[in-house]
Amino acid sequence: MPQPVSAQSAADQGRRSEIAVGVFQHGANFHPLGDRLIFDLPQLPPGEIYEGSEEDGTVDVQLLYRTAPLQFLLKPRLSAKVQISTAGRTSFASGGAEWRQHILRGRLYGQVGIGLTLHDGYRFTPDPFAAGLPAQEAQRRYDIYRRRTSFGSQVLFNPNASLGVRVDRRWSIEVAWEHFSHRQLFSDQNPGIDNIGIRLSRTLGR
């Protein structure tokens, strides 16, 4: 049975490393850093799709490790995570830092983070509309065009944020946002992608 969370136990657990597992919507229409949300895009002709939406609506599983807070630079936690597509789309591996702030005697917390990401997807997808392609090759490229996003770089930035509720001294539940893009630093192609999900986190140690 879950044990009540005291202010002291919440503080103690906040000084330990953590592991977490999450489920995310891959390609969610949510971006809090300035781009406006668009829910009523006009319908495109058959066979065409909006750039950056090729992978929208699929499901990812995320595995995450956080260190205990470091004792400098506002006490960040270093993080390592993999976000694996269950639909054969782009998967991500990231490393970074997260900063956490507790409220309500440690029962609730918010955190923001930034990281660098490598992915197994496409920097640029092959052009299915190039002249002179054999039909089989054109179809192969078109299938990629419909299902995979051109990120413009294999290295991406990963701003992220989450809100957590501590259930007991070891377990917490988080609602999380993960963004991947490169701000057009590496090429003009930069659709970016946003993911929204929920994580179950466990504090390590006794």
Name the predicted role of every residue range.
Residues 15-17, 53-61, 89-93, 153-159, ...:
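Residues that define the transmembrane beta-barrel architecture of outer-membrane proteins
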Residues 5-16, 67-76, 102-110, 170, ...:
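Short loop/turn motifs that connect adjacent beta-strands in outer-membrane beta-barrel proteins
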Residues 192-206:
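Outer-membrane beta-barrel "beta-signal"
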